[in-house]
Regions:
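Acidic donor-binding segment of Leloir-type glycosyltransferases
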Residues: 22-67
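N-proximal low-complexity "stem/linker" segments adjacent to membrane-targeting elements
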Residues: 1-23
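Structural beta-sheet core signal
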Residues: 3-5, 31, 95
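Short beta-strand-to-loop acidic/aromatic patch adjacent to the donor-nucleotide binding site
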Residues: 90-101
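A short, glycine-/small-residue-rich helix N-cap motif at loop->alpha-helix starts
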Residues: 70-78
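Well-ordered alpha-helical segments embedded in enzymatic catalytic cores
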Residues: 13-16, 78-82
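Active-site nucleotide-sugar/metal-binding loop of Leloir-type enzymes
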Residues: 80-92
């Protein structure tokens, strides 16, 4: 199974959802993250923590591809562009956001 996992600035959601997702033993994960809002240091810290937490949890578990935006693109544009990029790598995938606990 291939997974496209969409995250933003919620490390707590990553910590809740990713362990459950990993029980399904994904072969590859394409990690898509929007960037922090301009000038918002707290948002930048949360984005970085969410990214790092996801990477730490995925390390050694499966093949990981990353697509991390440097600046905030907004939900609609970031989700669309991230999924488009992921399907350049994957033929098929399950798509989940960090706040979806299967």
């Amino acid at each position: 199974m291939n997974l496209i996992y969409l995250i933003y600035n919620r490390p707590d959601c990553v910590e809740q959802s990713l362990p459950v997702i990993l029980e399904a033993c994904p072969k590859q994960v394409y990690l898509v993250a929007d960037g922090p809002k301009s000038g918002n240091e707290e948002d930048a810290r949360k984005c970085e923590r969410a990214r790092q937490r996801a990477l730490d949890m995925l390390d050694g578990v499966c093949e990981v591809h990353t697509d991390f935006a440097e600046e905030n693109r907004g939900c609609a544009r970031r989700v669309s562009s991230g999924i488009t990029q992921a399907f350049e790598v994957f033929d098929d995938a399950i798509i989940l956001e960090d706040d979806c606990v299967p």
